[in-house]
Amino acid sequence: MKIRPVILCGGSGTRLWPNQKNYQAKQFINFGNWTLLGKTLERIKKKIFDAPIISTNYKYLKEIKKHLRKHKIKKYKIVLEPAKMNTGPAILASSLIKDIPYSQPLLFLSADHLMERQNIFYKEIKRYQKYLSDKNIFIFGIKPTMPSSEFGYFLTKKKKKIDQVIKFIEKPSKSIAKSLIAKKGYWNSGMFFIRKNSIINNFKKHQLTTYKYCQKAVLKSKHIKNIYYLDKNEFIKSTPKSFDHAVLEKTKEINAIKLNIPWSDLGSWQEICKMFDKNKKNLIKKKNIFYRPWGRYINLFSGKNFLIKELYVKPNGILSLQKHFHRSEHWLITQGLPKITLNKKKFTKKINESVFVQKGTIHRIENPNKKPVKIIEAQLGSILKETDIVRYQDIYGRVK
């Protein structure tokens, strides 16, 4: 039997756009002729997959249809959530729609993940499909590349040929993350591999109320062509919990599929800056290089309400002490040891460390060293022009 991919596409992207009204959900951000949702849709075009199901909300329907047309996916089903109830009800409702066989393997994917070496991903899916049962759940783990507090972790023990999950740790501190990596812990990617009957059995056992009302929401849904409009009155009676809290924390039959591949959920501007730093050779154009007394900057990519730059600060180069009215900035240090000023605070940052400059914050970058400093900068705001600079001090005489 083929595997049915279910793409969870209801996230709002507020982690990237805090306190901003006019933001774009992460899965739809155009990073230069590609989006994260587009990458996900391309990922499920293999012959091992059946037509996808997309779980989303009314707000994103138009954008999702646009993506489906662009990526030439003609067979699909869309399940529209009438209210935001977290991933537990979303996963269950998507599983309960008709035409899905009771024992159908379902692969739950986030719409906003980047993944390389996908052949390994496909190989592991096919390898573990035979172990799916009407009770167990397989989660995908990513081998950590660093001790991050941005992800949940899990630990496993070997049981026959399968890695059984014995403990979950939700977004630990960096020191605890280091100890988890030493114990061969993996990042919890948020992707699941499970049969339909296992989802039903687990929700009946651990979240009976949610099961009852999601089932009613599906039965009473309006089914127009390939879109299911879930019944709001029933759906909102389900318990608004994530799938992790609703089921994973309660069931004992959880197994792991461990992946050692480049992966990111681009959940922060630091991760986005890393992505652009990795691919900057393909983005640099002479017309986008601008020279300043302190060094130079290169505009790598301009998106909706954001701009990605690389700053090159020469030895002893000092940017002006300045602030912006219309933008905030995220800096990722990729080379050197810059001295940073944020209002009255002064500190030094190392490679791979980041700095957030809130709109209106007086700030400065200095390079007191003999080697150059390189920083990937993400500017976020309604106005991203060089005119949005108020200078207080400048060794090059640019204060007006």
Predicted regions and their residues:
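Double-stranded beta-helix
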Residues: 364-400
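Glycine- and acidic-residue-biased ligand/ion/polar-headgroup-sensing regions
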Residues: 326-344
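Conserved N-terminal catalytic core of the sugar/cofactor nucleotidyltransferase
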Residues: 1-7, 15-22, 30, 34-108, ...
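Conserved beta-loop-beta/alpha segment of the NTase-like Rossmann-fold superfamily
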Residues: 73-159, 200-206
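A short glycine-rich, His/Asp/Glu-containing loop-to-beta-strand
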Residues: 287-328
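Catalytic core of tubulin tyrosine ligase-like
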Residues: 144, 153-287
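Short beta-strand His + acidic residue motifs that chelate non-heme Fe in jelly-roll/DSBH
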Residues: 320-322, 340-341, 357, 363-369, ...
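Short acidic-glycine-tyrosine-enriched beta hairpin
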Residues: 313, 342-363
